């Protein structure tokens, strides 16, 4: 009986380790301009990432976009959002680059509740992706508190996929 237990134990151990060893993983890094400008994000850390996610793009109520100033909190370094992307890309090659669409600020609830604003927003995001040769978006929504907000958020996701198509990471 003891021998059978050992065989079963090692069988499950072998299967478990085999499955664990086959798992793929991905390392993502969020890049915030004010941290990058202050040297708080090392180039080595960025090079170790599979994809870089740039913060922060916010919607206005009508679906137009606002971008975080990368020089917030200090007066040095890159001065524009596009400059931040170019600066990082010059140092880090071969990673996927996305923009984060999160709910930390902006008029998300009003924008996703309006069909025309959702369409405008999705088209504006596509323009940003094309202009900056980005690979996709990272959705980071954590604020939906009721059924209507979940529905509106879902409609915004569907609209994003419809406008962006399959060529962008989502």
Where would I find each of the regions flagged by the language model?
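Bacterial Sec-dependent N-terminal signal peptides
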Residues: 1-22
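Active-site neighborhood of glycoside hydrolase catalytic domains
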Residues: 150-170
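Short, solvent-exposed loop/turn segments at secondary-structure boundaries
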Residues: 111-115, 147-152
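Residues that line or immediately flank small-molecule/substrate-binding pockets and catalytic motifs
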Residues: 11, 56, 141-143
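Glycan-recognition patch characteristic of GH18 chitinases/ENGases
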Residues: 22-129
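Short acidic, glycine/proline-enriched helix-loop-strand junctions
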Residues: 71, 75, 148, 166-168
């Amino acid at each position: 009986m003891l021998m059978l237990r050992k065989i079963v134990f090692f069988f499950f151990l072998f299967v478990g380790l085999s499955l664990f060893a086959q798992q793929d993983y991905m390392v993502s890094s969020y890049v915030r301009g004010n941290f990058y400008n202050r040297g708080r994000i090392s180039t080595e850390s960025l090079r170790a990432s599979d994809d870089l996610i740039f913060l922060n793009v916010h919607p206005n109520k009508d679906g137009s976009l606002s971008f975080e100033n990368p020089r917030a909190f200090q007066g040095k370094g890159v001065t524009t959002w596009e400059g931040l992307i170019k600066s990082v890309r010059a140092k880090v090659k071969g990673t996927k680059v996305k923009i984060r669409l999160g709910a930390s600020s902006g008029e998300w609830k009003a924008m996703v509740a309006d069909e025309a604003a959702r369409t405008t927003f999705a088209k504006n995001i596509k323009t940003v992706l094309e202009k900056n040769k980005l690979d996709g978006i990272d959705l980071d929504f954590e604020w939906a508190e009721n059924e209507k907000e979940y529905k509106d958020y879902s409609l915004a996701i569907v609209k994003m996929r419809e406008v962006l198509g399959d060529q962008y990471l989502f």
